[in-house]
UniProtKB/Swiss-Prot annotation:
Keywords: Cell membrane, Flavoprotein, FMN, Membrane, Oxidoreductase, Pyrimidine biosynthesis. Its main location: membrane. This is Dihydroorotate dehydrogenase (quinone). It comes from Prochlorococcus marinus (strain MIT 9313). Catalyzes the conversion of dihydroorotate to orotate with quinone as electron acceptor. GO terms for biological process: 'de novo' pyrimidine nucleobase biosynthetic process; 'de novo' UMP biosynthetic process. The active site is at S209 (nucleophile). Pathway: Pyrimidine metabolism; UMP biosynthesis via de novo pathway; orotate from (S)-dihydroorotate (quinone route): step 1/1. Monomer.
Length: 392
C-alpha cells in the first residue's frame, strides 16, 4: 500500500500549531514583528514562484485543505464578486507581497496595506506586542510600508489577473503619510489611489488608526466629505469604503453612516484597533514592564469583540440594509463570524484571531456558516445578513 502524502498526514493548521503553537502561547516568545516579517518573506517568494511545479503543488495542497466552495456563500457587492465572505484584514500584507496567493488560504478577499504615498518606517520598536492569554495584540506600528510606488511595482511583478478576474478580491487600504500636514491629506491619499487604482478591486479610506498623529480627526464629517470628494474625482476610481474606529461616540457613528449613504460610498468597515483597554489597564507587558494603560497603541483581538459588534449594530440601525458593512475585530471563531453577519455584516475580516488560531480558522468559519445556513433554512448567506438570528 502506498504511503499517504505529507499533505494528508498533516493539515495546514496542524503544521502551523506544531511549529508555532508554543511561540504564540507565550508573550515573550519570538518577537511578533520578526515572526510576521519571516512569514511575509516566505509568502513573497511563494507568490513570485507560484507557477513553479514544486511550489504549485504545495499551494494546491494548501488550497485543497483550506478552501471551501459553496454557491450559497458567493456574493456580488459594490461590483465585486466574492466567492466567500471571509477576508484577510489590512495590516498583515502591508506591501502586497503575497497578493496573488491569498485565495489558496481560503480567503474570499484580502485587503492590502495600509499603504501611504511616502514610504515610511513607522514608529520606533518595539511596537507590536502579543497578549497570549487574552488572544489579543497591542500595536503602534505607525503605517510602516514601502510606499505606493513600490507597492505598484510589487503587484506588477506578481502578474495578477485583472480586477474582476481574480479568485480573491483585492482591496487597497489607504493611509495618510506621516509627513503630510492634515490639511493636505486629500491630495496625499489621492496620489496613492491614482497610482494604484488600476490594480485594486476596491479601496478603503483609513482614517481610524490610532497610531498616526491627527489621523482620527479625518473622521469628522466635514473633513471626511472633503476627502471622499477629492478621491471620487480621480479617473478610474474604484469603489470606496471607509474604515472607522471603535472608540467613536454614537452620534459620530450615526453621522458617518449618514455621510457614507449621502456620498454613495460602497461600504463601511467596522472597526479598527481601539485605544480602550477593555478592563486590561493593569495588564503588564513583559517586554517593557509597563501596563497597557501606560502603553500607546491600538488593541485588537478577542477583547474588542463586543465593542466591534456594538458599532456594527449601530451602523446597521442608522444606515439600513442598503449600505454594505464589513465586520472586523475579535473574530476568532465560526460563532463570532456568524454573530457579525447576523448583526448586519455582509463580509467579515480576520487578522489577530487568524494569527492565534492558525490558517484553518478560515475553513472552520466557512464550514460553520454553511452549517448555520442549513440549520436556519437560509438559501443564501445574504438572507442571514442583518437577520438577528443567533448561532445554534
Amino acid at each position: 500500500m502506498a504511503e499517504p502524502s505529507p499533505a494528508k498526514v498533516y493539515s495546514t493548521g496542524g503544521l502551523y500549531r506544531r511549529w508555532l503553537g508554543a511561540i504564540l502561547a507565550n508573550d515573550q516568545g519570538l518577537d511578533p514583528e520578526q515572526l510576521t516579517q519571516a512569514a511575509l518573506s516566505a509568502l513573497s517568494q511563494t507568490s513570485l514562484r507560484r507557477d513553479w511545479p514544486g511550489v504549485s503543488a504545495v499551494l494546491a495542497a494548501i488550497a485543497l485543505d483550506l478552501q471551501r466552495h459553496d454557491l450559497r456563500l458567493e456574493q456580488v457587492l459594490f461590483g465585486c464578486r466574492f466567492l466567500n465572505p471571509v477576508g484577510l484584514a489590512a495590516g498583515f500584507d502591508k506591501n502586497g507581497v503575497a497578493a496573488s496567493i491569498w485565495d489558496r488560504f481560503g480567503f474570499g478577499f484580502a485587503e492590502l496595506g495600509t499603504v501611504t504615498w511616502h514610504g515610511q518606517t513607522g514608529n520606533p520598536r518595539p511596537r507590536l506586542f502579543r497578549l497570549a492569554a487574552e488572544q489579543a495584540a497591542l500595536n503602534r506600528m505607525g503605517f510602516n510600508n514601502n510606499g505606493a510606488e513600490v507597492m505598484r511595482r510589487t503587484l506588477e511583478k506578481q502578474a495578477l489577473p485583472s480586477p474582476g478576474q481574480r479568485p480573491a478580491v483585492l482591496g487597497l487600504n489607504l493611509g495618510k503619510s506621516r509627513i503630510t500636514p492634515l490639511e493636505q491629506a486629500p491630495d496625499d491619499y489621492a496620489l496613492s489611489l491614482e497610482l494604484l487604482a488600476p490594480l485594486a478591486d476596491y479601496a478603503v479610506i483609513n482614517v481610524s488608526s490610532p497610531n498616526t498623529p491627527g489621523l482620527r480627526d479625518l473622521q469628522d464629517a466635514s473633513q471626511l466629505r472633503r476627502l471622499v470628494e477629492r478621491l471620487r474625482r480621480l479617473p478610474g476610481c474604484p469603489p470606496l469604503l471607509v474604515k472607522i474606529a471603535p472608540d467613536l461616540e454614537d452620534d459620530a457613528i450615526d453621522g458617518l453612516a449618514r455621510l457614507a449613504y449621502e456620498e454613495g460610498l460602497a461600504g463601511v468597515i467596522a472597526v479598527n484597533t481601539s485605544l480602550d483597554r477593555f478592563g486590561l489597564d493593569g495588564r503588564v507587558l513583559p517586554k517593557t514592564g509597563r501596563t497597557l494603560a501606560e502603553e500607546a497603541g491600538g488593541l485588537s483581538g478577542a477583547p474588542l469583540r463586543q465593542r466591534a459588534l456594538e458599532v456594527l449594530r449601530r451602523l446597521r440601525a442608522t444606515a439600513g440594509p442598503a449600505l454594505p458593512l464589513i465586520g472586523v475585530g475579535g473574530i476568532d471563531s465560526p460563532e463570532a463570524a456568524w454573530e457579525r453577519i447576523s448583526a448586519g455584516a455582509s463580509l467579515v475580516q480576520l487578522y489577530t484571531g487568524w494569527i492565534f488560531k492558525g490558517p484553518d480558522l478560515v475553513p472552520n468559519i466557512l464550514d460553520g456558516l454553511i452549517g448555520q445556513l442549513d440549520r436556519h433554512g437560509f438559501r443564501h448567506v445574504s438572507e442571514a445578513v442583518g437577520s438577528g438570528v443567533p448561532w445554534q
